[in-house]
Amino acid sequence: MTTTEPRTEREILDRDSVDDVDAIAEFNPDPVEIIHAVEDQAEALFTWDYSKGSRPRLDKLYEKAKVSQWNAQTDLDWSIEVDPLEAFSIFTESSNVNTGHWTEHPDSPAKNWGDKEWDQFSIESFAWRLSQFKHGEQGALLCTAKIVETVPWIDAKYYAATQVVDEARHVEVFEKYIDEKIGVRYPVNPHLQLLLDDIINDSRWDMTYLGMQIMVEGLALAAFGMMHQVTTEPLLKKLLRYVMSDEARHVAFGVLSLQEVYQDMTAKEVRERQEFAFEAGIRMRDRLLQQEVWDRMGCDVKKAVEHGLNIPDDDQIFNQLLFSKIVPNCRKLGLLDAGDGWLREKYTEIGVIELEHLEDTGEEYSTFSIEDEQLATDRS
């Protein structure tokens, strides 16, 4: 949908304010639906220009993707035993959920918890995280298939086709880990679902790129990086390393493609992309509040959300770092300061603008790549 005037925050988010607790506290209990349908407004485009390599950086990504494929069933050692509590409690500690703001504050829903409750929370929280990643990867699977259909460049179609395979593998590997090693699963968070629906529903192919390749995949890459850094569980560590090597290419695909597209856009068109980047950032912030976990732990979800929104700045580091790929990439694309710098102002308000000078993913993907020799060694 295009607009003639810049929209207000209320119009962008369809709620009273950025921190509307009632809206943010919405959560998805055990799911009823098995199939979720979203209308896809886009046209499928053929191109008769088959000139491979006319966009060299995309062609380089395509060639890299072809030799970087791995098998979720055979390239990971699924015989490794996993103790959920030992493996996952470190993520609760690293995300500052068990700090004084949650353990001692009089308004905290967890103020009376003992070790038993915190142990259960660690397992539930990690199961929720991996479940949301799995749902997000299915969203990426659908969105990338849409990019194959809608992008007008043959080099982009070629690369996007490899990403479809990557995303199928990611859904597969997260489901297998959840099923075999955790045994606890969660439905899709409504804030994530709303964002995925918006991305798929939009008719403009570059919005699919922005929503999925830059925003959703950018947050996932940052999250996987932090999880890989802190985990000592060997199966999860290797799984995340493989997934990160794919995700870095995916985000780079978005950056390299959109750089070209945005150069020729009008100020009005760029503002619409800024608004979407802001909306996506808020939706992802909202989904990080683990509404379904608090519900399963028997807490008042609205009170938990309200308490989570009031975390002191010093304890916000984990959530802020999840934007460590998004903000630099928006800067690289020129979205932060385009027009009157509206997106910079909004990212300042939600406390993530200081991440803008971290490395963007346009070329960074090479630092995450798994070389052919490493794959061969892993398989020997």
Regions found by a protein language model. Name each.
Residues 1-143, 149-157, 180-187, 191, ...:
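Terminal targeting/low-complexity segments that flank the catalytic cores of oxidoreductases
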Residues 131-134, 138, 161-164, 168, ...:
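Short amphipathic alpha-helical segments with heptad-repeat character
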Residues 136-143, 170, 216-223, 250:
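Amphipathic, well-ordered alpha-helical segments in soluble domains
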Residues 141, 171, 175-178, 251, ...:
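A structural signal for well-ordered alpha-helices, especially hydrophobic packing surfaces
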Residues 143-147, 161-162, 221-227, 239-242, ...:
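A structural feature that tracks compact, well-ordered secondary-structure segments
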Residues 153-183:
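Carboxylate/His-rich catalytic cores and anion/metal-binding grooves
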Residues 176-248, 272-283:
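Active-site-proximal alpha-helical scaffolds that flank and shape metal-associated catalytic sites
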Residues 239, 251-261, 278:
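Helix-loop elements that line ligand-binding/catalytic pockets
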